[in-house]
């Protein structure tokens, strides 16, 4: 007799899972951990319930369990993440192929230009750096742009890497993305008009790079190119970020962009 299975669709991707294979409790626990962020490093039971959509009673039980397991700490009113959660990120960074392969290339770019470079991926409405240039002799003297430490999350619509990664999506998906996440104004230079933003994505897709000036934070400028795999699919973005009082846009286009493109081409044969 043929079995008919019910499936649950992922809210942010095309993934599906059979309902009998889905563990709702695990999903809620992970959602609770994700509720903590830069904007809200300490949360109480009510705030967690509001952020995750679960009841206060359930939120309290999840918080207590995660505290017992060592992932959270508390002062009996607010909860916050502990260093134990870094086990997940360290495991990813030590096992993921792209960050390991890209590291030496990023360091070389940094040595050539004394600027900061990173590999960034798209995660829903945010971009996440998974590899970053590092040269001890220069990092001691150089001020790193805000948000470029590994694992930090930045709004995709206001970053060069985000627009590169969004530009390769189908128009229907781009519109759905905008409708779902919006185009929040972060600085006077953030693009918040949907039509203008879509036109910008078209221009990025055609030119195969994106230059972004002070859209996420005043005083910062960045340029990014897509990183493709051997099958021609965009899997990440490679960018260079600096202060506006240190480099001019034309310098990034004339001098840094060719370096980014050459590096992206070399990575394509390795990922």
UniProtKB/Swiss-Prot annotation:
GO terms for biological process: 3,4-dihydroxybenzoate metabolic process; catabolic process; negative regulation of DNA-templated transcription; positive regulation of DNA-templated transcription. The keyword Transcription applies. Keywords: Activator, Aromatic hydrocarbons catabolism, DNA-binding, Transcription, Transcription regulation. Induction: By p-hydroxybenzoate. Gene3D superfamilies: 3.30.450.40, Winged helix-like DNA-binding domain superfamily/Winged helix DNA-binding domain. Residues 98-271 form the IclR-ED domain. Residues 45-64 bind DNA. Residues 23-83 form the HTH iclR-type domain. Disulfide bonds: none annotated. One of its GO terms (molecular function) is DNA binding. NCBIfam families: pcaR_pcaU. Positive regulator of the pobA gene for p-hydroxybenzoate hydroxylase. This is p-hydroxybenzoate hydroxylase transcriptional activator. The gene is pobR.
């Amino acid at each position: 007799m043929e079995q008919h299975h019910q499936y649950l669709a992922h809210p942010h991707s095309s993934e599906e899972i059979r309902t009998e294979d889905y563990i709702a409790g695990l999903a809620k626990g992970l959602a609770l951990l994700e509720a903590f962020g830069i904007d809200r490093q300490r949360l109480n039971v009510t705030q967690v319930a509001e952020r995750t959509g679960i009841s206060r009673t359930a939120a309290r039980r999840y918080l207590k369990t995660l505290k017992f397991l060592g992932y959270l700490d508390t002062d009996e009113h607010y909860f916050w993440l502990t260093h134990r959660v870094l086990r997940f990120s360290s495991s990813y960074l030590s096992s993921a192929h792209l960050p390991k392969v890209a590291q030496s290339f990023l360091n070389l770019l940094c040595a050539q230009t004394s600027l900061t470079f990173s590999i960034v991926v798209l995660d829903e409405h945010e971009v996440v750096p998974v590899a970053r240039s590092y040269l001890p002799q220069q990092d001691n003297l150089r001020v790193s742009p805000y948000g470029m430490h590994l694992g930090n999350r930045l709004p995709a619509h206001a970053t060069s890497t985000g627009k590169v990664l969004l530009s390769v999506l189908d128009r229907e998906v781009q519109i759905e993305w905008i409708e779902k996440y919006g185009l929040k104004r972060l600085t006077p230079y953030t693009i918040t008009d949907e039509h203008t933003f879509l036109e910008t994505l078209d221009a990025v897709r055609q030119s195969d790079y994106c230059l972004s000036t002070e859209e996420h934070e005043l005083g910062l400028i960045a340029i990014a190119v897509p990183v493709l795999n051997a099958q021609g699919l965009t899997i990440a973005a490679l960018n260079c970020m600096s202060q506006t009082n240190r480099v001019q846009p034309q310098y990034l286009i004339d001098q840094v962009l060719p370096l980014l493109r050459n590096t992206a081409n070399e990575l394509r044969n390795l990922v």
